[in-house]
């Protein structure tokens, strides 16, 4: 089962996958502590600088600097609503790697417990939130990738030249495929 695989492969003490995120960060920065705090905040739903500042307690200027390093090194990306210009201030930060996203959402804050072999609480928390976690991030990404491929295979009424998502204060659309020449779009939620 997925629960048993998570327990056996991710929650065991001294697991190489447990060390991977910090080892990766250390390749880019000498002191990963604040970067880890920012990645944990993003993984738990803080996607704009203001939310990340509130979650981490770091100064806004420092958060912006750290986010720039994380973005340049490929750990995070800044997504803009597809309907807005690239320099829009409405961008949201997301962790690019699915495993790192999972690690910083579920495992980072439980390192001491896991090192002592205390797995049940972590597993219960993961089970409780896994479906929402997959739906919120992984499933949406798969759907956006499908939109690109389906357009290329002519399985859609047109070929989207841009695929992403869009949002404002009231609503979010998870999948938007837009053809700028034909001024057509497909929406998926």
Please describe what each predicted stretch is:
Residues 91-189:
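A cross-kingdom feature that marks ATP-driven nucleic-acid transaction machinery
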Residues 1-104:
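Interdomain hinge/linker elements that couple catalytic modules in large macromolecular machines
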